[in-house]
């Protein structure tokens, strides 16, 4: 990934709902189990698809030298002011299925063409803060296919994404190493790594 200069946050200011494109801030009036009226602040996604899912993240598995690797990304994220290690992801278009969105986003962000193998249930990112949700789609990348021989990203203006593989057997260890180097680790990738580690520890015996 070639860049002229290192990205950085220049200013953070308040944003009115009428000026926001992707999210809005809402106040919820609700009643608890005792009948008491309470209030809650929430951030709301304003771009939800007809599938009632905001986004997909793609857990793309690619074989390298006979070993499965997960395709990861490095991308600067302004809300945290640092580079984040994550997996390919993006919003689901209005009339798009989650599976189609996953294949499209994978190709746009990495250049690879994948095959959907499985998916999670609808998952809520931070239900104490927002209604934003997503599905994680498991996809295989067949490196023998002609379309995967010379992958070319199709990034939008302002997108700068570096893709790199991490071996599944050392994913947890590698993420800790990257964190020590100053990178943020996305919750989806970190949770997968912990689940993989726990599965190998508790289910292999």
UniProtKB/Swiss-Prot annotation:
Give one Pfam family: NUDIX
Q: For this entry, list what GO says about its biological process.
A: nucleoside phosphate metabolic process; ribonucleoside diphosphate catabolic process; ribose phosphate metabolic process
The EC number(s) this enzyme carries: 3.6.-.-
Main localization of the protein described in the UniProt heading: cytoplasm
- What are the record's GO terms for cellular component? cytosol; nucleus
A single Gene Ontology MF term assigned here is: ADP-ribose diphosphatase activity
Q: Quote the CDD domains the UniProt record gives.
A: NUDIX_ADPRase_Nudt5
Instruction: Please give the name of this protein.
Output: Uncharacterized Nudix hydrolase P35G2.12
